[in-house]
């Protein structure tokens, strides 16, 4: 094999095998440049429907379309050489029937080249997940807080504080695991419950606002990088403040344009003088 042979990307099977062996690192990515920056450091890159809020200024993820997810999925795939890439099925593209879910998941995978799809839902989606997995579509499950159901769930809030919530999330996790999801996002769930799910389920859990005991963690990259400032969830740790850096850079640019300092001679093309030989 050539020393320059392209390294194979991680697969959904690789991610599943990490349970109990290594913590899974997952971040969201929506564009080629960001995917290139994150790829060397991540096991999983998620093209999340959160792009509706952090890129398009929507109040929820409900308005995101399949065409939007395909466009951003393609962009991310162009920037990835290492990580496994999963793309969200957006609201309304899989809930009607397992056949609808299959058609849209096939389109998503064929048109982006991604490694699998993510969908939200527990017991009510278990049959759909099993249907997709049996037909060759890897599924990343999602239980606990489900952003696509924000209008019926009473907003964005942590879950598992009551017996009813605990039992629902527990049943959901078991159902999605038994349906064959290769991994499961556990979102906005109290620590003891997330820990118990992680210990019980065969599939690795990837927490967001859940427990450090989860098999991995995911954050929205724009939150982690300090690019999204509309609100900051309790579970977000900001590792950079790129929003402030961008604002400061724009202000410096504006000052230099208005003062005439930019562009300077080093940024300006001049007419080349012909050489004495005429060449």
UniProtKB/Swiss-Prot annotation:
Pathway: Cofactor biosynthesis; (R)-pantothenate biosynthesis; (R)-pantoate from 3-methyl-2-oxobutanoate: step 1/2. Its EC number is 2.1.2.11. Mg(2+) binds at residues 49, 88, 120. GO terms for cellular component: cytoplasm. Its cofactor is Mg(2+). Gene3D superfamilies: Phosphoenolpyruvate-binding domains. One of its GO terms (biological process) is pantothenate biosynthetic process. Binds 1 Mg(2+) ion per subunit. 3-methyl-2-oxobutanoate binds at residues 49-50, 88, 118. Catalyzes the reversible reaction in which hydroxymethyl group from 5,10-methylenetetrahydrofolate is transferred onto alpha-ketoisovalerate to form ketopantoate. This is 3-methyl-2-oxobutanoate hydroxymethyltransferase.
């Amino acid at each position: 094999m050539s020393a320059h042979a392209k390294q194979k990307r991680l697969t959904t099977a690789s991610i599943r095998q990490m349970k109990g062996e290594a913590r899974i690192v997952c971040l969201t990515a929506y564009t080629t440049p960001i995917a290139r920056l994150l790829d060397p450091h991540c096991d999983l890159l998620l093209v999340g429907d959160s792009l509706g809020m952090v890129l398009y200024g929507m109040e929820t993820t409900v308005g995101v379309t399949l065409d939007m997810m395909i466009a951003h999925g393609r962009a991310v795939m162009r920037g990835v050489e290492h990580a496994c890439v999963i793309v969200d099925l957006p609201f309304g593209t899989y809930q009607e029937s397992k056949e609808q879910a299959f058609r849209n998941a096939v389109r998503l995978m064929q048109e982006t080249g991604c490694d699998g799809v993510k969908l939200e839902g527990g017991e009510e989606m278990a049959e759909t997940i099993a249907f997709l997995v049996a037909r060759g579509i890897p599924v990343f499950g999602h239980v606990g807080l489900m952003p696509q159901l924000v209008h019926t769930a009473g907003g964005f809030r942590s879950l598992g504080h009551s017996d009813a919530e605990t039992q629902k999330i527990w049943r959901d996790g078991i159902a999605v695991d038994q349906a064959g999801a290769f991994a499961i996002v556990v979102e906005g769930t109290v620590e003891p419950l997330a820990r118990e799910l992680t210990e019980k389920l065969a599939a690795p859990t990837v927490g967001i606002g859940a427990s450090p005991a989860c098999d991995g963690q995911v954050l929205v990259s724009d939150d982690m990088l300090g690019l999204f400032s509309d609100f900051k969830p309790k579970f977000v740790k900001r590792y950079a403040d790129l929003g402030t850096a961008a604002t400061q850079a724009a202000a410096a640019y504006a000052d230099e344009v208005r003062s005439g300092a930019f562009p300077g001679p080093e940024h300006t093309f001049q007419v080349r003088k012909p050489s004495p030989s005429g060449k």
